[in-house]
């Protein structure tokens, strides 16, 4: 049992260190982005399958889209990082019910992703600060409070926006846009 606790704490510490490194790299423009064309539908299916295997909740994990495929210019590993973070966060606050990842084509230029859960939701007074560093909805929940800050920086770097849907009251809904084609400004690669 002691070994399990040490292992778990080691993993949490490593995650915290990696989050701090990611945050610093993003803030100073040092994080490498490898932009290429990827099928966002396939990425969403893969992420949903992955999180479904490790989730520690009875909530049903779903992926919804009307699209057969949607090729976007992105850094697929960073897109997966954002999606996994949002889905894992949802599992922490949704003991049962459902968590739904949805992908839509908002326009010819923009994809729209959302993660909706039927959990406890985020109080209105916390919504404005939820993307700040070290902000946590539940101080007792595992995590560093850096994940949403990192998600925001990644999404902004690739030319999108991320927000909480303030009108959804059945839990919480995080929404973000992602350009289908990268422009010169948001696809530049850092050295």
Name the predicted role of every residue range:
Residues 8-13:
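Short alpha-helical segment of the dimerization/phosphotransfer core of two-component systems
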Residues 90-91:
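Short helix-loop "hinge" at the ATP-lid/N-box region of the Bergerat-fold HATPase_c
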Residues 147, 151:
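Short alpha-helical Gxxx[C/S/T] motif in the catalytic ATP-binding
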Residues 34-39, 60-70, 106:
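Conserved catalytic submotifs in the C-terminal HATPase_c
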Residues 122-134:
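Short conserved segment of the HATPase_c
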Residues 24-35:
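Helix-loop junction within the histidine kinase core
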């Amino acid at each position: 049992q002691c070994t399990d606790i040490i292992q778990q704490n080691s993993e949490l510490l490593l995650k915290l260190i990696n989050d701090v490194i990611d945050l610093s790299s993003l803030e100073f423009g040092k994080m490498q982005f490898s932009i290429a064309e990827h099928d966002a539908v396939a990425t969403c299916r893969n992420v949903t399958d992955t999180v479904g295997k490790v989730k520690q909740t009875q909530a049903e994990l779903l992926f919804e889209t009307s699209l057969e495929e949607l090729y976007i210019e992105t850094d697929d590993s960073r897109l997966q990082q954002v999606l996994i973070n949002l889905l894992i966060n949802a599992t922490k606050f949704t003991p049962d019910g459902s968590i739904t990842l949805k992908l839509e084509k908002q326009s010819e230029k923009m994809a729209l992703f959302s993660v909706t859960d039927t959990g406890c939701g985020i109080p209105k007074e916390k919504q404005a600060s939820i993307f700040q560093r070290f902000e946590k909805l539940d101080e007792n929940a595992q995590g560093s409070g850096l994940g949403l800050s990192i998600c925001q920086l990644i999404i902004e770097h690739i030319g999108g926006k991320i927000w909480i849907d303030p009108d959804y009251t059945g839990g919480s809904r995080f929404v973000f846009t992602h350009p289908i084609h990268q422009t010169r400004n948001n696809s530049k690669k850092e050295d």
